[in-house]
């Protein structure tokens, strides 16, 4: 925070953490997903933020989101669902985003997520045939399951392992598969790809 304050001063509107650090699940290899929102952002601000990040000893782990407040307010609402609920505030608040996070936004998050996963899965089955891509698609699917669970329960389940308590059917299978892959489980490419493709296909047609 001190470096941020020295760089941007009172222009800072929000600072938070996303990802494994935000959820308290970080390991030594985890990326540090910082969210920094300023009053406004110019290309010069991006360069200044880059210079600030270069001063950090763990620069290679730094990633995240850097934006002006007006851009965030006008962002695609379906993207803001995961953004809001997966961000742990350090300074400031994102609560004003709640005004756009209605059921339509969450429904759209499910639909867009399923479409992207379906395309990525079929493309990977045909062309890339990559286990790493499949793992990434299951990670993306776990976020869609969070949105599905939110629509069904009204609660955001932040930790994927806790989704097992509120999901059933294919949502539970998707979550179990993701957690298994995350812990180093063996990739069964054809079987896992088919499960993911069929699951995404269902939500494209039923959302």
Regions picked out by a protein language model, each given a short descriptive name:
Residues 1-6, 10, 22-28, 39-207:
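Catalytic core of pol beta-like nucleotidyltransferases
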